């Protein structure tokens, strides 16, 4: 089961979140049938949103949009505070690797664009923030957002490793944030440790990558685990929700669906679930509008 572990240095100087998001990203790949680069880009976005959502309280919903002007198109993710996340990528078929190493490429094909977050507190006044894409690798773009928009200097590592068949092998990440109690000496020490950390891809390849991430972040520094919470890819779409959407259409449009298509098929963008509405269903909706 996927999880996020929240922790804090015993000194109170900084906190860290580490995530295992393997099942989340694997299910997203399965639902959207994404190729290698699209899988990694979508996966990193989902993990970034899992981190953001873990920072929220109540029934907030957090939307992350990675909007580039190149190969991937838009990547959209929505998460809640209960560990659920969903998402999709416009172009599922990007499959670009380095010839020599087989490394899956993302950043060079993201293009120019923005990292957009929308936090809906349920009050009718969502908070929206937009920062430019810095590298297109998503992790660095997320870190820049946290520093610029939330005024919280953060170190971020996100990645998705694929097997020889380009299926998700492991996915996860971390966030480290300096807290107000940190002294200049402590900040310098942690910055040095983060600079010396192995690459996120190397840590994820460890047998127990969650423990490997924590060990790399804290070293010999004592720390406390604050919580361990489950994570999952879960869509909240339903037939009732799409029926309500059909109810908003003019009667003429609904009648055209009956006359021309003998019904309607609606596909959820976030999870690919198909909902069928036959002629009788559409006629009932028309009658309800009368």
UniProtKB/Swiss-Prot annotation:
* Main localisation: cytoplasm
- Which subcellular locations apply to this protein? Cytoplasm
| GO CC terms, sorted | cytoplasm
One Pfam annotation, family name?
A: HSP33
Q: Which terms does the record give in the GO molecular function aspect?
A: protein folding chaperone; unfolded protein binding
Transmembrane helix as UniProt keyword: no
Role summary = Redox regulated molecular chaperone. Protects both thermally unfolding and oxidatively damaged proteins from irreversible aggregation. Plays an important role in the bacterial defense system toward oxidative stress.
This one is known as 33 kDa chaperonin
Please spell out the taxonomic lineage of the organism that makes this protein. Answer: Bacteria, Bacillati, Bacillota, Bacilli, Lactobacillales
């Amino acid at each position: 089961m996927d999880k996020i572990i929240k922790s804090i240095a015993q000194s109170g100087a900084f906190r860290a979140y580490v995530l295992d998001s393997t099942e989340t990203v694997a299910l997203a790949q399965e639902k959207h049938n994404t190729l290698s680069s699209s899988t990694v880009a979508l996966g990193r976005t989902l993990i970034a949103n899992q981190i953001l959502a873990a920072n929220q309280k109540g029934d907030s919903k957090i939307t992350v949009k990675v909007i580039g002007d190149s190969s991937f198109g838009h990547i959209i993710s929505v998460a809640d505070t209960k560990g659920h996340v969903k998402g999709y990528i416009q172009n599922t078929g990007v499959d670009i690797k380095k010839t020599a190493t087989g490394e899956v490429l993302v950043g060079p094909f993201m293009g120019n664009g923005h990292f957009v977050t929308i936090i809906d507190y349920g009050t009718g006044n969502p908070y929206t923030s937009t920062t430019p894409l810095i590298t297109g690798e998503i992790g660095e773009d997320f870190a820049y957002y946290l520093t610029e928009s939330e005024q919280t200097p953060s170190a971020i590592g996100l990645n998705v490793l694929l097997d020889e068949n380009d299926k998700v092998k492991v996915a996860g990440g971390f966030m480290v944030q300096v807290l107000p109690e940190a002294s200049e000496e402590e900040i310098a020490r942690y910055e040095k440790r983060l600079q010396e950390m192995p690459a996120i891809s190397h840590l994820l390849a460890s047998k127990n990558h969650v423990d490997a991430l924590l060990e790399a972040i804290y070293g010999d520094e004592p720390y406390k685990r604050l919580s361990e919470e489950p994570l999952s890819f879960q869509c909240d779409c339903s037939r009732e929700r799409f029926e309500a959407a059909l109810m908003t259409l003019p009667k003429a449009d609904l009648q055209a669906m009956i006359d021309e298509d003998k019904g309607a098929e609606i596909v959820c963008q976030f999870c690919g679930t198909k909902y069928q509405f036959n002629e009788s269903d559409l006629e009932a909706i028309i009658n309800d509008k009368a």
